[in-house]
């Protein structure tokens, strides 16, 4: 989940403006206004994916009530922060995506704490998240930097496509070079055995 959710969410976040300008060229002002929201909602997507994965782990170990409790906690935080931020003239509607991000971050943190306490095989979170986070940070930097260079020689709305391609290549190369992708990760994909052999995964 982290190998897919992290780059997808980070990519949406760092290239929010360019992506929206590409999709909605006829309304640049609206696209620019929405970019702020997508910056936070892109990050929220990461935690939505992690929430689903951690909920599944807890349910598999017979702790079905914990995801319900953590979801309620996240919902309460969302309501409170939404009320405070959207009601503040300084932030107004811009507070909505921020409160959404807070909501899912809290849910995931509580789920991870519950997994560490309830699952017999204590998960090594540092080992699980360190490499994907490092690779994603480099990928996000590559995406933003390459867009900044490309936009000087290409129309703004088209510079985002090669920037995304560069980010995908950077992420893929680093994931393989640092061993973040294993044979077990690939084997479940269609033609996974063949892909694993081509990539020399063990």
Where are these regions (language model features)?
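Short alpha-helical transmembrane segments in multi-pass integral membrane proteins
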Residues: 1-14, 23-27, 77-78, 93-119, ...
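Residue-level hotspots within the lipid-embedded alpha helices of multi-pass solute transporters
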Residues: 5-10, 41-49, 71-75, 101-105, ...
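Membrane-embedded alpha-helical segments of multi-pass transporters/permeases
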Residues: 9-17, 22, 40, 79, ...
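Interfacial segments at transmembrane-helix termini and the short loops linking adjacent helices
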Residues: 12-45, 90, 94
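Membrane-interface junctions at transmembrane-helix termini in multi-pass inner-membrane proteins
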Residues: 39, 43-73, 83-84
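Alpha-helical transmembrane segments
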Residues: 54-62, 112-128, 181
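Membrane-interface helix-loop junctions in multi-pass transport and translocation proteins
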Residues: 65, 72-113, 123, 141, ...
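Membrane-proximal transmembrane or re-entrant/amphipathic helices at the cytosolic face
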Residues: 144-202
